[in-house]
C-alpha cells in the first residue's frame, strides 16, 4: 500500500462522530500517523482531510485534501488511490474535489533520481494536473484523460549537474522509438554552472525513431522558432536497432553567435548582433 501498511498488519483505530444535532464531523486515527477529519452538511461530505505524517489544516469547503509524507514510494501503488478519488469526484452528488499534497525525500523516475520532492495533484475532467518542485526541476505535468491527447511537461526550472548529463548521454541502448509523445517546455535550463536558456518542442515517437517538432527557444543565442512565417524548426533522431542518425532542418535565428562558443567552452572567435541559419 502507498502509506506503508501491508496486508494483514493490525493498527489501532479510533473514530469520533460529532452531531449538532445532525451529523457534522468524523474524526479518525489509524496508528500513529494516519489522521482523517471529514466535515458534513445534511449528511453529505463537504470537505475534509486525510493526512499521513503531515501537520496540515482542514481545507476550505469543496476540497478533500489528501496530504502525506514518505521517504519514497512506488508511483504505481498510487494508481488505485487516484482512481478511487477520481471516481468519487465525478459522482453527481459530490460537492468536493480531491487534492493530493505529497512530499518525498526522493523518487526514482525512469533513469533519474529526484530529491526533496513536493507535489500537488488535482483531478480535473480532462486531465490530471501535477504541480511539483524538486532538487532538479520545478514545473507542471499535465496528464490527459483521453488517449487522443498527449501529456505536457512544462518546467520553470531544470538544473542538471554536468556529471549527470555526461552520464546520461554516454548511456548505451537509448531507443528513441520507445519515447512517449509529449509537449515539453523549460523556461530556465542550466547544466552545471552554465545557463543554457529556454526551449520548447513537441516530441513524437515514430517507427524509425523520434521527431522533435515545432522547436522554439533561446539556446546559447540560437533562436529556433523566431521566424513565425517560415517553416517550423524540427529535429529528427533515427535508430534502426544498431546505429543512430540525426538531422536538424528549418530556420534558426541568431543573436550573438559568440554566446554559442562560450556555452560550448569553445574560444570565442566571432560575435554577431543578429542573423539567421537555415538547416536542410
What are these regions (language model features)?
Residues 1-280:
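Membrane-proximal interfacial segments on either side of biological membranes
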Amino acid at each position: 500500500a502507498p502509506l506503508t501498511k501491508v496486508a494483514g498488519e493490525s493498527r489501532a483505530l479510533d473514530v469520533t462522530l460529532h452531531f449538532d444535532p445532525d451529523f457534522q464531523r468524523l474524526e479518525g486515527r489509524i496508528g500513529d500517523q494516519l489522521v482523517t477529519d471529514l466535515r458534513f452538511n445534511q449528511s453529505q461530505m463537504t470537505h475534509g482531510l486525510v493526512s499521513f505524517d503531515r501537520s496540515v489544516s482542514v481545507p476550505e469547503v469543496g476540497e478533500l485534501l489528501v496530504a502525506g509524507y514518505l521517504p519514497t514510494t512506488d508511483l504505481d501503488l498510487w494508481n488505485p488511490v487516484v482512481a478511487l478519488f477520481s471516481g468519487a469526484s465525478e459522482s453527481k452528488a459530490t460537492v468536493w474535489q480531491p487534492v493530493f499534497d505529497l512530499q518525498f525525500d526522493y523518487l526514482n523516475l525512469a533513469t533519474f533520481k529526484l530529491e526533496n520532492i513536493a507535489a500537488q495533484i488535482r483531478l480535473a475532467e480532462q486531465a490530471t494536473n501535477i504541480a511539483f518542485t524538486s532538487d532538479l526541476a520545478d514545473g507542471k505535468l499535465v496528464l490527459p484523460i483521453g488517449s487522443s491527447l498527449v501529456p505536457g511537461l512544462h518546467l520553470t526550472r531544470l538544473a542538471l549537474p554536468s556529471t549527470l548529463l555526461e552520464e546520461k548521454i554516454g548511456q548505451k541502448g537509448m531507443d528513441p522509438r520507445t519515447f512517449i509523445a509529449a509537449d515539453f517546455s523549460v523556461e530556465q535550463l542550466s547544466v552545471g554552472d552554465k545557463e543554457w536558456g529556454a526551449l520548447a518542442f513537441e516530441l513524437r515517437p515514430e517507427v524509425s525513431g523520434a521527431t522533435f517538432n515545432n522547436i522554439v527557444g533561446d539556446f546559447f543565442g540560437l533562436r529556433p522558432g523566431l521566424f513565425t512565417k517560415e517553416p517550423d524548426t524540427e529535429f529528427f533522431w533515427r535508430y534502426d536497432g544498431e546505429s543512430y542518425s540525426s538531422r536538424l532542418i528549418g530556420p534558426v535565428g541568431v543573436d550573438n553567435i559568440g554566446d554559442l562558443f562560450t556555452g560550448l567552452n569553445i574560444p570565442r572567435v566571432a560575435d554577431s548582433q543578429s542573423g539567421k541559419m537555415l538547416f536542410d
